[in-house]
Amino acid sequence: MKLRGVYAPIVTPFDANENINYDVLKRLIDHVLANGVVGLVPGGTTGEVYALSESERMDLFKFVKDYAGTKAVLIAGTNSGATRDVIRYSQAAAKMGYDALMVAVPPYSRPNQRELLAHYSAVAEAVKIPIALYNFPWRAGTEVSYEVLD
């Protein structure tokens, strides 16, 4: 898979009752696509994924797929602190028809490079769609080394 163009890590808008506001999300998706964005990344840090329950995350992925799946390349942010959860979210996104995944370093645990390799390898073995490694050392406390990428 070759990534070309602009991919937007989209926010997850909430209403006053802390539910995902899908009307606002539709307008956001329409706006970014009308302005040249070719791909959407729901479920990333910008999307406040840490504030979503598992069912909300799955509902978000399904909504974005149903609403924009024919208009944009979709990359699901499937980050979590536990590899088994990343695998479950990744398999669900792949089954929904997402084009790729974005997987960050597990937060808070500060894994070493051997542990990172084991984490990413387990996810890659569990799904058959491309994975973009999200290297955000300031947030994760660990940087993905070139050895892990190789």
Residue ranges and their predicted role:
Residues 1-8, 13-143, 149:
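Active-site beta->alpha loop and helix N-cap motifs at the rims of alpha/beta catalytic domains
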